């Protein structure tokens, strides 16, 4: 080979090497599965909270951010919001059995931290004893703690020692001091009482049934409830109304096997169908690029808007119109690993936060990760990704027509 040709080939090889390395890197990055992405994001969200709280250091180390329009309530509500909302989204994942995969090791670590954190939360001697006995706000986030126990009963409630369990029963019971307004707050009382019922403790049936009856009255049609007597176009059907209504009905009626004699219109199976319809609407909200509409209050809760879709997937309740691969692909397109825990919708945007919002509130975002409670070999994770409705529509593909849901 002539020297000039050799030098030319050497130059080409040197120039191509970075490109080849980049291509190999991209290929390696592409090999990250959707489940690995989801698990990584949720671990990143949960680890700083639980690692600190397990040692009683959350309140010492968490930097609190309050809305510029904060209403002056005790800022310590932040820690209860952070912990309760996080655990409501994390509970299904932590309920999976242990294994020696990288994910399994992270999950086991989070569960160990979580169980210690639960104990810290109700120990009056702990620096991380939460604000159970002041303000009305603790009712809200106690409901998310209770919801975490409902969603992960065997993994998160059963292993707690008897003293910690007794303390939770006492804290949940004393929250009857809070008279909830006639809004989604009624479901917070109901969720706490439903957990007490499941745990074999004395529950207040009136607080459960009156809430269920009121929410049933607030159904306005086509998968939507009003949040109180007047309808508001926001995401509270996602954050509270659909999930807690269905889960309370599930507990109180034994999955629809029993009827509520003084509230016969409160029907578990029908509430499921409404949530399925709402899930179909949420799926259509997701744009081809993975964005969703920004409207209504509490938009800083980000992916918490997807909770009904996540709950339907985790519980195996997806309607026939939505496939596993379609829902997983749509939800994965929405997730963003950055900027979860600061006031804002996408990064730091404090002025869009509401008067009741702090950075603990934002852990509502964890509620989109419920499908991690499905094992890795479940069709939700193994089915090939499919284009979701908006992606098909804007891509010029055939897509299903949408029709209103009537009862």
Say what each PLM segment does.
Residues 1-27:
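Bacterial Sec-dependent N-terminal signal peptides
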Residues 266, 270-354, 383-398:
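Non-catalytic carbohydrate-binding regions of carbohydrate-active enzymes
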């Amino acid at each position: 080979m002539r020297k000039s040709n050799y030098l030319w080939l050497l130059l080409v090889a040197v120039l191509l090497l970075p490109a080849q390395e980049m291509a190999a890197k991209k290929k390696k990055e592409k090999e990250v599965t959707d489940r690995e992405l989801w698990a990584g994001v949720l671990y990143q969200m949960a680890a700083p909270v639980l690692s600190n709280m397990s040692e009683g250091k959350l309140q010492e180390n968490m930097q609190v951010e309050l809305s510029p329009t904060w209403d002056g309530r005790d800022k310590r509500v932040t820690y209860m919001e952070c912990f309760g909302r996080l655990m409501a989204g994390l509970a299904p994942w932590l309920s999976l059995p242990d294994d020696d995969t990288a994910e399994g090791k992270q999950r086991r670590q989070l569960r160990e931290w979580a169980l210690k954190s639960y104990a810290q939360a109700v120990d009056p001697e702990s620096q991380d004893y939460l604000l159970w006995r002041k303000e009305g706000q603790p009712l809200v986030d106690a409901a998310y703690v209770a919801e975490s126990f409902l969603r992960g009963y065997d993994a998160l409630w059963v292993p707690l020692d008897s003293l910690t369990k007794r303390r939770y029963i006492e804290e949940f019971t004393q929250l009857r001091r809070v008279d909830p307004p006639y809004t989604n707050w009624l479901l917070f009382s109901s969720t706490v009482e439903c957990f007490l019922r499941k745990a074999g403790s004395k529950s207040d049936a009136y607080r459960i049934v009156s809430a269920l009856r009121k929410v049933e009255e607030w159904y306005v049609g086509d998968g939507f409830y009003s949040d109180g007597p007047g309808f508001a176009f926001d995401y509270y059907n996602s954050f509270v109304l659909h999930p807690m209504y269905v889960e309370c009905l599930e507990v109180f009626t034994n999955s629809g096997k029993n009827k509520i004699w003084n509230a016969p219109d409160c029907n578990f199976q029908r509430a499921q169908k409404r949530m399925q319809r709402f899930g179909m609407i949420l799926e259509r909200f997701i744009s081809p690029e993975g964005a969703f509409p920004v409207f209504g209050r509490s938009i800083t809760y980000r992916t918490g808007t997807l909770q009904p879709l996540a709950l339907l997937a985790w519980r195996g309740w997806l309607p026939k119109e939505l496939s596993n691969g379609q829902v997983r692909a749509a939800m994965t397109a929405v997730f963003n690993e950055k900027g979860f825990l600061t006031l804002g919708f996408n990064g730091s945007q404090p002025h869009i936060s509401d008067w009741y919002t702090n950075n603990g509130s934002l852990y509502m975002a964890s509620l989109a990760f419920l499908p991690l409670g499905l094992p890795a070999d479940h069709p939700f994770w193994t089915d090939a990704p499919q284009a979701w409705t908006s992606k098909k529509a804007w891509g010029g593909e055939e897509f299903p027509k949408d029709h209103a849901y009537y009862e």
